[in-house]
Curated annotation (Swiss-Prot):
Organism: Mus musculus (Mouse)
Every PID domain range: 58-200
Superkingdom of the organism of origin: Eukaryota
Motif (Nuclear localization signal): 6-7
Region (Interaction with KRIT1), start-end ranges: 136-139
GO MF annotation, one: GDP-dissociation inhibitor activity
Basic residues biased stretches: 1-10
Localization per Swiss-Prot or TrEMBL: Nucleus; Cytoplasm; Cytoplasm, Cytoskeleton; Cell membrane
Chain spans, region Interaction with ITGB1: 139-141
Keyword Transcription regulation: yes
The name this protein goes by in its record: Integrin beta-1-binding protein 1
Residues found modified as Phosphothreonine: T38
Disordered: annotated span: 1-55
Traits of the deletion mutant: Mice show severe defects in osteoblast mesenchymal cells to compaction, proliferation, differentiation, and mineralization and to a delay in bone nodule formation. Suffer also from an excessive microvessel growth.
């Protein structure tokens, strides 16, 4: 049932609009195996701000990533049950084991751009747009080791629609955990910038 006998575990701060990166081994109630993993999480469902502003976020920070897959239009009850980073990671694990999400991404690389307006995933020539995620519809972002032993990390987004009636999960592969954490950091700065400008 488990890929190479490994399971993902995470720990994360519940502080809103902050990134938490911790390394620790956690025992699982699903079995005796555990491994160390580093998880960065961004909870955006908040009105808190660190007060830091970045006026350069009109321009986009760009990262080369690969697209793994998505689970769209989750029911409200199912979507709301996926609150913490561990909930998202476990849900994605089960979806991969059930064949709803692939373990490996498409070969094609995409450009993930982050700005104060949200996230845009486009083709490397910038002519085609794969996905757009408006900033105000992103509920949580979490990144973690993919568990396949190649040093790659997964970046998962939980989004909602404008009416908050449906939830979706979007999964991308990053070249490293450092790249995934950098994306989380830029997105956190984008939220802080918008929240700061809203208060002024």
């Amino acid at each position: 049932m488990f890929r190479k006998g490994k399971k993902r575990h995470s720990s994360s701060s519940s502080q809103s609009s902050e990134i938490s990166t911790k390394s620790k081994s956690v025992d699982s109630s699903l079995g005796g195996l555990s491994r160390s993993s580093t998880v960065a999480s961004l909870d955006t469902d908040s009105t808190k701000s660190s007060g830091q502003s970045n006026s350069n976020l009109d321009t986009c920070a760009e990262f080369r990533i690969k697209y793994v897959g998505a689970i769209e239009k989750l029911a409200v009850s199912e979507g709301k049950s996926l609150e913490g980073p561990l909930d998202l990671i476990n849900y994605i694990d089960v979806a991969q084991q059930d064949g709803k999400l692939p373990f490996v991404p498409l070969e094609e690389e995409f450009i993930l751009g982050v700005s104060k307006y949200g996230i845009k995933v486009s083709t490397t020539d910038q002519h085609g747009v794969l996905h757009r995620h408006a900033l105000y519809l992103i509920i949580r972002m979490v990144c973690y080791d993919d568990g396949l032993g190649a040093g790659k990390s997964l970046l998962a987004l939980k989004t909602t629609d404008a009416s908050n009636e449906e939830y979706s999960l979007w999964v991308y592969q990053c070249n490293s955990l450092e790249q995934a954490q950098a994306i989380c950091k830029v997105l956190s700065t984008a939220f802080d910038s918008v929240l700061t400008s809203d208060k002024s």
